[in-house]
């Protein structure tokens, strides 16, 4: 009796080559990285909108004053610069930890 009560014999699953497995793994990693980048961009935009609007727009109206526009531009630039610096530091630390972990694994 085959899988799930079928009377037909179960077919053998095709063996995946090491190249297929590596390609699938690389594709999955790339997709996850892209999704994480998109989530981070959405989070950045949300934070910029929330904080800069609260700090720069004192009296919402039909248009922005020159000072509000300048404040928003400055605020957004600061947030983006900070975000980039934090991201670079995080990536550098993660890379260092990955290299150290790989070195320890090869020693064993």
UniProtKB/Swiss-Prot annotation:
Keywords attached to this entry: Chaperone, Disulfide bond, Membrane, Metal-binding, Mitochondrion, Mitochondrion inner membrane, Protein transport, Translocation, Transport, Zinc
GO molecular function: metal ion binding; protein transporter activity
InterPro entries: Tim10-like (IPR004217), Tim10-like_dom_sf (IPR035427)
Localization per Swiss-Prot or TrEMBL: Mitochondrion inner membrane
GO CC annotation: mitochondrial inner membrane; mitochondrial intermembrane space protein transporter complex
Signal peptide segment: none
Primary subcellular site in the record, as a coarse category: mitochondrion
Disulfide bonds: 52-75, 56-71
Topology of this chain in the membrane: Peripheral membrane protein
Gene Ontology BP term (one): protein insertion into mitochondrial inner membrane
Record motif Twin CX3C motif, residues: 52-75
Top-level taxonomic group: Eukaryota
Assembly mode: Heterohexamer; composed of 3 copies of TIM8 and 3 copies of TIM13, named soluble 70 kDa complex. Associates with the TIM22 complex, whose core is composed of TIM22 and TIM54. Interacts with the transmembrane regions of multi-pass transmembrane proteins in transit.
Domain remarks: The twin CX3C motif contains 4 conserved Cys residues that form 2 disulfide bonds in the mitochondrial intermembrane space. However, during the transit of TIM13 from cytoplasm into mitochondrion, the Cys residues probably coordinate zinc, thereby preventing folding and allowing its transfer across mitochondrial outer membrane.
Family, similarity comment: Belongs to the small Tim family.
Function: Mitochondrial intermembrane chaperone that participates in the import and insertion of some multi-pass transmembrane proteins into the mitochondrial inner membrane. Also required for the transfer of beta-barrel precursors from the TOM complex to the sorting and assembly machinery (SAM complex) of the outer membrane. Acts as a chaperone-like protein that protects the hydrophobic precursors from aggregation and guide them through the mitochondrial intermembrane space.
Protein name, UniProt field: Mitochondrial import inner membrane translocase subunit tim13
Gene assigned in the entry: tim13
């Amino acid at each position: 009796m085959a899988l799930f009560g079928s009377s037909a014999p179960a077919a053998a699953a095709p063996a995946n080559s090491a190249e297929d497995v590596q390609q699938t793994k690389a594709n999955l990693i790339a997709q996850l990285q892209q999704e994480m980048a998109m989530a981070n961009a959405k989070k950045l935009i949300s934070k910029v909108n929330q904080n800069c609007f609260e700090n720069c727009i004192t009296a919402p109206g039909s248009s922005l004053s020159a000072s509000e526009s300048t404040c928003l531009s400055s605020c957004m630039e600061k947030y983006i610069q900070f975000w980039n610096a934090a991201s670079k530091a995080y990536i550098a630390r993660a890379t260092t930890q990955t290299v150290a972990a790989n070195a320890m694994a090869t020693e064993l």
